[in-house]
Amino acid sequence: FVKGDAAMTQDQIYQNIAQRTGGDIYIGVVGPVRSGKSSFIKRFAELMLLPRIKNEAQRARAKDELPQSAAGRTIMTTEPKFIPEKAVSIDLKAGGSFRARLIDCVGYMVDGALGHEENNAPRLVKSPWFDQAVPFDQAAETGTRRVIREHATIGLVVTTDGSVAELPREKYLPAERRIIAELDEIGKPYLILLNCTEPDSEPAHALAAQMEEVYHHPVCPINAVNLTAEQLNNILQKLLYEFPLREIAVSMPSWVTMLEPGHWLQSSVYQALLELAGSVHKMGDMTRGKPQLNCANTTGVTLTGMDLACGQVQLRVGIEPDIFFKILGEETGLPITDEASLLPCMLELAKAKAAYDKIKSALEQVQATGYGIVMPGIEELHLEEPEIVRQGGQYGVRLSA
């Protein structure tokens, strides 16, 4: 289990994602054209995949398959491409392995980008999804949709603030909105990357915050060309929090669960928990702000742990201290309002129980046979002084009580 946004090692991140995706980590990198998708894939592969390929020949071949990237408005990627061509099998230090690769897409067209037309007419290209040549725009969008729906297990949307390809931010918005809407419809986990020349600047962070409000998804400002391994680890860890929440394990004072089924306190707490469960869908929903429990009888709910590999979160529910005494009074009919009144009641009940235990067996006999005998306890017996008696040629000891 991890707490909140506790940092994980690269192995832990890979292992958790691999468990969530059944051992295949296929990252579909999608978004508008000329936003930096190929640059991101190249940097990701160089830092996160290639160093983990043990076979030197395989590593060299994978390096040759990395996409080309360049500045300007000309579209560099012309068809979807798996990077590397064959999935890389990566062994984890803690045991187990997974297969990983990225999928580079052409992306959705952006007004002002170059390369999708020839002689002022749509550029026709051949695509594995069509029997005949089709316009570049159509092939690009179809390929992107097929990659996300049929191949990728997780998604990364790469868009930009307009500082990376000589195209203003406004040009990217239609394509950006379309791809995010489609990802929401498909339901696969994804993260939004905002490619900027200055990702640490105030405008970049302000735009990222604005996008998070619009898309209701985490947005990470990055510089795709200069990403570090630590930044990529953070991206993957954030991506883990976009997986579905499968189970909520709740702990609360044990006496609450011992109440009769349907008790008013149980009903109010359980109903509040059901409402909370209905309002969260992803692991990240539990970490973005404190979980809220709408129940007047509780002191709140605390996130105590998360199992990112299987989608479980652990919550602890606190109960108002006065509620315990209130329910104790209701259930017993005794005037119990606090600890001071509880102790005398407990002492009195203990004496009553001791007295009852003496006659308990006799009462059971009465119910069974009509009469019962109350046997005295050891503390009630008085032993007389033993007396030696003689009867004929025999001696004995007479005990009287």
Residue map of PLM features:
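Charged helix-capping and loop-helix junction motifs
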Residues: 171-177
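P-loop NTPase catalytic nucleotide-binding module
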Residues: 128, 153-155, 159-163, 168-169, ...
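Conserved G1/Walker A P-loop phosphate-binding module
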Residues: 3-131
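Canonical P-loop GTPase G-domain recognition
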Residues: 178-191, 196-263
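Conserved catalytic network of the ASCE P-loop NTPase/AAA+ motor domain
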Residues: 91-96, 147-151, 182-186, 213
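Inter-motif core of Ras-like GTPase G domains
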Residues: 113-166, 182-183
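Conserved nucleotide-binding/hydrolysis micro-motifs of P-loop NTPases
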Residues: 106-110, 161-164, 197-200, 225-228, ...
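P-loop NTP-binding site
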Residues: 5-14, 19-21, 25-34, 44-47, ...
